[in-house]
From Swiss-Prot:
This is Argininosuccinate lyase. It comes from Buchnera aphidicola subsp. Schizaphis graminum (strain Sg). Pathway: Amino-acid biosynthesis; L-arginine biosynthesis; L-arginine from L-ornithine and carbamoyl phosphate: step 3/3. The gene is argH. It holds the Pfam family Lyase_1. Its EC number is 4.3.2.1. Keywords: Amino-acid biosynthesis, Arginine biosynthesis, Cytoplasm, Lyase. GO terms for biological process: arginine biosynthetic process via ornithine; L-arginine biosynthetic process. It is an enzyme of class 4 (lyase). It catalyses: 2-(N(omega)-L-arginino)succinate = fumarate + L-arginine. InterPro entries: Arg_succ_lyase_C, Argininosuccinate_lyase, Fumarase/histidase_N, Fumarate_lyase_CS, Fumarate_lyase_fam, Fumarate_lyase_N, L-Aspartase-like. CDD domains: Argininosuccinate_lyase. The keyword Phosphoprotein does not apply.
Length: 459
């Protein structure tokens, strides 16, 4: 059944019909389409298109249809309808006859599809928020469990300054907090109903759009029908948020892949989220993390795709907008799956504390402390930086750590240095000194963990 055949003399070419059909992917919107259709049927009662009895028959048939789909989800895909709207209308008519043909009065697929999409996106946002918050909780759990594990912090993948594993965890808590904020912000603009906009210029029926919007759980209704059916900003924003968050997940994965490598050996990943080699029996590969890292690309691709689809598109609805869905559906599923896997990885992670500390002791990550020490003794920072660099070069030549250099060597570079230098360049001292807000000092980390536990209601 086609919803638009009256004006045409010839049947659609079969190849074109398949090319034109969106049912193979927009069937995902079946619950939203039925939900919005029930709300629409109630509005049609208020304007005299339907009687109360007719509306109840339509609603009952739609609910029955939803239950049938629940029991046999393949039922939709076994048909050859153009889209989910035509599938629902055709099956409604099969159930209740001519009455089913009244439902589409005053409504266009143009406002229908964007309403369905907004309802679907709203539902998915709450699922994603739960997954992100759960991941944050796992970061906090791991941070609290390992708050005394000192490891190197890196710049340019070179050891830079000592940090703790807890501090690393808290960095990602902040990243994902921004992701939560973005989703909540998107929700404000998404939560506006376009239903009742018609094809592009509004509906000729005096529908109470405010009441209709609230009945579907929206906060308000849109103000311009032409914009309403054209608007896909909310998809751009949602795909942008997913791209940013997947970038965070990809960086998280890259960090752990390196930490898990034989060269670093900071962590051990659980057998449950790794795999082996078909040839090399010793291998334990971080497949879960590598897949998250790779899947980031497909999500970024979906964002680029929707931007390109919209960039030269005239108002209002154009068939190009059919291409707004597959990337969206895939991206949000990929994002949520990646969040769930990231939580699994964290839940089962084991730290090699000794390896972490040994790595922090190497690479002269305490060199900055010498510069700060000399500044406190009265030297300018630029000169102190130079002296510290010379001492690092000397330690490299002697194949020693800075802590192992004799006091006489320190003093040969600056008379300001006394034997208190040693207590100032221990790893613990490096951490304790960075007690400004946001610093790596253990007390600051404990405060931050408490604040985050309070925010996430896990005290």
């Amino acid at each position: 059944m086609s919803l638009w055949g009256g004006r045409f003399l010839d049947e659609s070419n079969e190849t074109f019909k398949k090319f034109n059909a969106s049912l193979p992917f927009d069937y995902i919107l079946v619950k939203e389409d039925i939900f919005a259709s029930i709300a629409w049927s109630k509005s049609l009662v208020e304007v005299g298109v339907l009687t109360q009895e007719e509306q109840k028959k339509i609603e009952s048939a739609l609910i029955s249809l939803k239950e049938e789909i629940y029991n046999n989800s393949k039922k939709i895909l076994e048909s050859d309808y153009e889209d989910i709207h035509s599938w629902i209308e055709a099956n409604l008519i099969k159930k209740i006859g001519e009455l089913g043909k009244k439902l589409h009065t005053g409504r266009s697929r143009n406002d229908q599809i964007t309403t369905d999409l907004k309802l679907w996106c709203k539902r998915k946002i709450f699922v994603l928020l739960d997954s992100i918050i759960n991941l944050q909780k796992n970061f906090i759990f791991v941070a609290e469990l390992n708050d005394d594990v000192i490891m190197p912090g890196y710049t340019h993948l070179q050891r830079a300054q000592p940090i703790t594993f807890s501090y690393w965890c808290l960095a990602y808590v902040q990243m994902f907090k921004r992701d939560v904020s973005r989703l909540k912000d998107i929700l404000k603009r998404l939560d506006i109903s376009p239903l009742g906009s018609g094809a592009l210029s509004g509906t000729a029926w005096n529908i109470n759009r405010k009441k209709l919007a609230i009945s579907m759980g929206f906060s308000s209704e849109t103000n311009n029908a032409l914009d309403s059916v054209s608007d896909r900003d909310y998809l751009i924003e949602l795909l942008s948020a997913s791209s940013i968050s997947m970038t965070h997940l990809s960086r998280f994965s890259e960090d752990l892949i390196f930490f898990n490598s034989s060269e670093a050996n900071f962590i051990e990943l659980s057998d449950s989220i790794t795999s082996g080699s078909s040839l090399m029996p010793q291998k334990k590969n971080p497949d879960a993390l590598e897949l998250i890292r790779a899947k980031c690309g497909r999500v970024h691709g979906a964002l680029v795709s929707i931007l390109v689809v919209l960039k030269s598109l005239p108002l209002s609805y154009n068939k190009d907008l059919q291409e707004d869905k597959e990337g969206l559906f895939d991206s949000l599923k990929t994002w949520n799956d990646s969040l769930l896997i990231a939580s699994l990885v964290l839940k089962n992670i084991k730290l090699n504390r000794l390896s972490c500390r040994k790595a922090a002791e190497k690479g002269y990550s305490n060199a900055t402390e010498i510069a700060d020490y000399l500044v406190k003794k009265g030297m300018t920072f630029r000169e102190a930086h130079h002296v510290s660099g010379k001492l690092v070069l000397r330690a490299i030549k002697e194949n020693k750590s800075l802590n192992d250099l004799d006091l006489s060597i320190f003093q040969s570079y600056s008379a300001l240095i006394t034997d208190d230098i040693y207590k100032n360049i221990t790893l613990e001292a490096c951490l304790e000194k960075r007690s400004s807000k946001g610093g790596v000092a253990p007390n600051e980390i404990r405060k931050e963990i408490f604040k985050e536990k309070e925010r996430l209601n896990i005290l």
